[in-house]
A protein has these predicted regions:
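Short, structured coil segments at secondary-structure junctions
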Residues: 14, 133-134
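Catalytic active-site module of serine/aspartate enzymes centered on a nucleophile-bearing elbow/loop
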Residues: 135-180
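Conserved alpha/beta-hydrolase "acid-adjacent" motif
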Residues: 120-126
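Glycine-rich nucleophile elbow surrounding the catalytic serine of serine-hydrolase chemistry
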Residues: 1-8
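Conserved alpha/beta-hydrolase catalytic His-Asp/Glu region
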Residues: 54-92
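Flexible "cap/lid" loop of the alpha/beta hydrolase fold
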Residues: 14-50, 91-95
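The feature captures the conserved acid-bearing segment of alpha/beta-hydrolase catalytic domains
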Residues: 100-106
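Short beta-strand/loop motif that positions the catalytic acidic residue
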Residues: 107, 113-115, 119
């Protein structure tokens, strides 16, 4: 949901650049919600239990299957468990109806759209749709899941983002750039 917050911010505010990590697709979350409901029918119950500190083996497996890569260890899932919380109903409604929002003109700025190759929530095939809205570069992190910052492959994601930021700074400082 963090990328949706960044996109909303950019509708009315300026920034030098943006990184959208595992973004909600322009079509909203309805498709992802339906896919999870059909492929992992116990997910919503298990996610709710995990957000209350009930870390059953089934709940942890389901959380891993949806949000993380297979390489993310059970100890890490339990450690991250204190950050699990129920989703905001208002946010869920807003993101479900995202496709119906009137889109304001977008400012021209460098944007990187990053997703995990193993993201079960928003698969990498959807990243180009978000990237097209921003004329952005796409980066797919091999074997990473949805939760890029906590996934076992977080260092690869962080390095890819850091490299992109360094290049964006160099381009902005180059003679003839739009900041001159």
């Amino acid at each position: 949901m963090g990328s949706a917050v960044v996109e909303r911010f950019l509708e009315r505010n300026r920034a030098q650049a943006a990184v959208l990590m595992a973004p909600v697709p322009p079509s909203g979350i309805l498709g992802a919600t339906m896919k999870i409901a059909l492929t992992e029918p116990a997910f919503f119950d298990r996610q709710g239990r995990a957000s209350r500190g009930e870390y059953t083996p089934e709940a942890l497996r389901t959380i891993r299957d949806v949000y993380y890569s297979r390489e993310t260890g059970t100890d890490d899932l339990i450690r991250f468990g204190r950050f699990f919380q129920s989703e905001s109903r208002r946010a869920i409604l807003d993101l479900t109806l995202l496709a119906m929002r009137v889109r304001l003109p977008r400012a021209a700025l460098p944007v990187l759209v990053v997703g995990g190759e193993a993201d079960a929530l928003f698969p990498p095939a959807g990243l180009p749709f978000t990237a097209a809205r921003w004329q952005a570069e796409v980066a797919v992190i091999p074997r990473a899941g949805h939760t890029l910052m906590l996934d076992a492959h977080w260092q690869i994601a962080a390095q890819r983002i850091a490299t992109w930021i360094e290049r964006a700074v160099q381009r902005a400082a180059a003679p003839g750039s739009s900041t001159d």
